Amino acid sequence: MTDMQTPFVAKVVVHMGVGEAGERLVNAENIMADLTKGAKPIRSYARNTLPAFGIRKGQPIGCKATLRGKKAMDFLEMALKTYAVENVLHTRQFDATGNFGFGIEEHTDFPGQAYDPKIGIYGMDIIAVIEKKGTRTARRKIQQKKINSKLHVAREESMKFVTETFGIEVE
């Protein structure tokens, strides 16, 4: 397999949906900054008004952080060890383009995170984007081009990459 055909982790997105603004959102941002080793989380805002949940359009309801490079790999390894107790991911967690995601119900499952009754417990969603070198040519603004089908990451390729790189079985 050539260097252009080898998949890699392009980015990891960590998302925490709180559902309300205020102290809970600030606590979630602090937890995320601590877990991601200093990556500054940005706020996500409600797209629509949902009166049943007391959410107005434009209200901050969550936070997210994007990690790339070595930080992304380190965080993903730590998160997979936390999530996959039996070293298993399911095929339904992978999409058609090779990306995969999973959720962690309690931030206290991460090493070094203790329960604090003043803060509470927060869950998070983690999405890993798997790409091959050369895929940027399809996304860039100037001289955008189509890419060969060999540069697309297939679902099976991504599963094989996760198994070989992180030692996680895919069922």
UniProtKB/Swiss-Prot annotation:
GO terms for biological process: translation. InterPro entries: Ribosomal_uL5 (IPR002132), Ribosomal_uL5_arc (IPR022804), Ribosomal_uL5_C (IPR031309), Ribosomal_uL5_dom_sf (IPR022803), Ribosomal_uL5_N (IPR031310). SUPFAM superfamilies: RL5-like (SSF55282). Keywords: Ribonucleoprotein, Ribosomal protein, RNA-binding, rRNA-binding, tRNA-binding. It comes from the Archaea. One of its GO terms (molecular function) is rRNA binding. GO terms for cellular component: ribonucleoprotein complex; ribosome. Belongs to the universal ribosomal protein uL5 family. This is one of the proteins that bind and probably mediate the attachment of the 5S RNA into the large ribosomal subunit, where it forms part of the central protuberance. In the 70S ribosome it contacts protein S13 of the 30S subunit (bridge B1b), connecting the 2 subunits; this bridge is implicated in subunit movement. May contact the P site tRNA; the 5S rRNA and some of its associated proteins might help stabilize positioning of ribosome-bound tRNAs. Part of the 50S ribosomal subunit; contacts the 5S rRNA and probably tRNA. Forms a bridge to the 30S subunit in the 70S ribosome. This is Large ribosomal subunit protein uL5. It comes from Methanocorpusculum labreanum (strain ATCC 43576 / DSM 4855 / Z).
